[in-house]
């Protein structure tokens, strides 16, 4: 599991928009679920894909619980929490602000494709959606981020 720790934490840190404490909690929950479910791993997908899917599900469940309780102050996955081009400090736009304009699905696709160098097929497996949908999310994400500049 040690070989997957850094990549998984980086993935979760980006999903949580830099919230280190939440990242630690989600990573711990992910590894606990993996340990408990290890016998059910069938080997159909690569282990890393299975691990990231569990992590993504943990994040998604966290977001859903926050929304249901009305506590989603960070706006995880909330496209309404967008940044206008006029809010940018000169020409430097940091990654966190770029990620905030994306929906949860777009952000996940971007992180997996550009930061983790995952192929489209693996991203589709992790996100449980067709490859064409992943490509659409990436395309929309690029368009949204381009508007910021």
Language-model features, listed with the residues they occupy:
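Amphipathic, Lys/Arg- and hydrophobic-enriched alpha-helical face
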Residues: 1-20, 37, 99
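Residues within the DNA-recognition helix of helix-turn-helix
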Residues: 4, 137-140
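Short, charged helix-capping/linker segments at alpha-helix termini
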Residues: 10-29, 131, 148
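Structural recognition of an alpha-helix C-terminal capping motif at a helix-to-coil junction
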Residues: 25-32, 45-57
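Arg/Lys-rich amphipathic alpha helix in sigma70-family domain 2
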Residues: 36, 40-43, 53-73, 88
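Internal acidic/polar
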Residues: 61, 68-95, 99, 119
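Short, Lys/Arg-enriched C-terminal cap helix and immediately downstream tail that follows
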Residues: 64, 139-149
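A short pre-motif secondary-structure segment
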Residues: 109-113
């Amino acid at each position: 599991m040690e070989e997957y720790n850094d990549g998984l934490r980086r993935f979760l840190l980006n999903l949580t928009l830099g919230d280190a404490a939440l990242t630690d909690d989600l990573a711990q929950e992910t590894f606990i679920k993996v340990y408990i479910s290890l016998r059910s791993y069938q080997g159909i997908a690569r282990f890393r894909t299975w691990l990231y899917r569990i992590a993504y599900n943990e994040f998604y469940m966290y977001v859903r619980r926050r929304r249901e309780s009305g506590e989603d102050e960070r706006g995880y996955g909330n496209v309404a929490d967008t940044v206008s081009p006029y809010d940018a400090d000169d020409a430097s736009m940091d990654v966190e602000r770029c990620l905030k304009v994306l929906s949860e699905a777009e952000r996940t696709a971007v992180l997996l494709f550009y930061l983790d160098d995952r192929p489209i097929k693996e991203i589709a497996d992790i996100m449980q959606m067709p490859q064409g949908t992943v490509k659409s999310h990436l395309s929309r994400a690029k368009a949204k981020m381009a508007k910021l500049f």
